């Protein structure tokens, strides 16, 4: 992994203003009127990742979320799902094997959050094991999607912890120089 130049300050500001506060307010309204809160949309996680990693959205319709990173989010201790659609799944899987992966784990109405970065070289064997399964899946009639997951334990063991938030407070952030 190259030297890190991450933007913790702006990412944490984004988290407070656009993820945590609005989410908690919306969650209360959803509950009050008997709805299940759907959570934070993927595009918000991708924007959060782009700010943190000083990256940009991938302009292509297929492939990784950002130019240099794939972004995943899941509840604390949950696996991270990867989903591949029939017509672009192979291209997406191949593209994701060429970028590092940013994993956000969250809990307690997003009050707690960890961000970890996993070098793509550690994920390539997993992606290679999925490739024949993905191809077989699409040979079956009616199959439009292929889903697999990277376990939380793998991410914790192999990922570099970039930041950690507890009860809405930033309690850990890796040095901006990557140390």
Task: Go through the PLM ranges and name each one.
Residues 1-68, 73-179:
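Nucleic-acid endonuclease domains
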């Amino acid at each position: 992994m190259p030297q890190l130049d991450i933007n913790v300050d702006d990412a944490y500001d984004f988290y407070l203003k656009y993820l945590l506060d609005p989410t908690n307010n919306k969650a209360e309204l959803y509950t009050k009127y008997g709805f299940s809160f759907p959570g934070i949309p993927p595009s918000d996680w991708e924007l959060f990742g782009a700010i943190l990693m000083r990256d940009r959205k991938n302009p292509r319709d297929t492939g990784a979320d950002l130019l240099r990173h794939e972004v995943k989010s899941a509840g604390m201790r949950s696996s991270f799902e990867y989903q591949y659609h029939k017509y672009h799944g192979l291209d997406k899987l191949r593209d994701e094997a060429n970028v590092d992966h940013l994993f956000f784990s969250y809990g307690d109405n997003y009050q707690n959050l960890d961000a970890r970065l996993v070098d793509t070289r550690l994920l390539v064997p997993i992606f290679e094991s999925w490739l024949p399964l993905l191809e077989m899946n699409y040979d079956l009639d009616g199959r439009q999607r292929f889903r697999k997951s990277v376990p939380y334990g793998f991410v914790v063991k192999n990922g570099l912890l970039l930041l950690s938030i507890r009860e809405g407070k930033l309690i850990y952030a890796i040095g901006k120089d990557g140390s």
